[in-house]
Every structure is written in structure tokens, then in C-alpha cells.
């Protein structure tokens, strides 16, 4: 884990079932949800949402005024996008350029 990244782990019955990693970009007053994951056997129980809500509160307490998360636009990330939108995140279009080497 990078020095500027904070990680919290969700535990159920003594075992890890999910985690969230957050980076603070103090120069922009922005907190970034860098990574969030929940064990497939425990998905759909609100663990991811609880981790995200915890991280948002932590970012706010740390003085951040914006929270950001990046995710894929493919079908495999549809549940993640739905969760972020349900928690108040809004889509921000980004231009990405690629060059074949």
C-alpha cells in the first residue's frame, strides 16, 4: 500500500469480506476512492455501500470537499456504477486518448 493510501477492511465472523482504499489529494481538497472490493459471497448485503459511506465521512473529516471514484464503463462494472450513483456520485465525462505503439 502506498504511503498516501489509507485502507480499511470489513470483517464478518472474524474474516475479511471487503475493503476500501482512499487517497487524499489535499492540494485539490479531493478524496479519491482508489479501490473498493467485496467478496462475491458477501455481495448484495450493503458492505460496499457501508465502506463507501465510511470513507466519505472520513474524507470530509479530513477536510476534503470533493470525493471522486473511477470505474469502468463495461457491463462488469454496472453494479459498481449503480452503487456510486445511489450514493450521490455524478458522472463526469473524461476524454481519453490512445495511440497504438
PLM-predicted stretches and their roles:
Residues 1-34, 39, 52-53, 58, ...:
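Acetyl-CoA-dependent GNAT
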Residues 27, 72, 97:
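Residue-level "edge-of-site" marker
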Residues 34, 70, 95:
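A cross-family glycoside hydrolase active-site/sugar-binding cleft signature
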Residues 36, 41, 72-74:
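Short strand-loop junctions, especially beta-strand C-caps/beta-turns
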Residues 38, 44-57, 61, 82-86:
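Conserved acetyl-CoA-binding loop-helix of GNAT-fold acetyltransferases
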Residues 52, 75-80, 97-101:
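Short glycine/proline-centered loop/turn elements that form peptide/ligand docking sites
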Residues 59-72:
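Conserved GNAT acetyl-CoA-binding A-motif
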Amino acid at each position: 500500500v502506498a504511503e498516501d493510501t489509507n485502507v480499511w477492511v470489513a470483517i464478518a465472523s472474524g474474516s475479511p469480506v471487503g475493503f476500501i482504499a482512499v487517497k487524499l489529494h489535499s492540494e485539490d481538497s479531493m478524496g479519491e476512492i482508489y479501490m473498493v472490493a467485496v467478496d462475491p459471497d458477501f455481495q448484495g448485503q450493503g458492505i460496499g455501500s457501508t465502506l463507501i459511506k465510511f470513507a466519505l465521512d472520513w474524507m470530509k473529516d479530513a477536510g476534503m470537499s470533493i470525493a471522486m471514484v473511477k470505474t469502468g464503463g463495461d457491463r462488469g462494472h454496472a453494479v459498481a456504477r449503480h452503487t456510486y450513483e445511489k450514493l450521490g456520485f455524478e458522472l463526469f465525462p473524461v476524454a481519453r486518448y490512445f495511440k497504438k505503439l
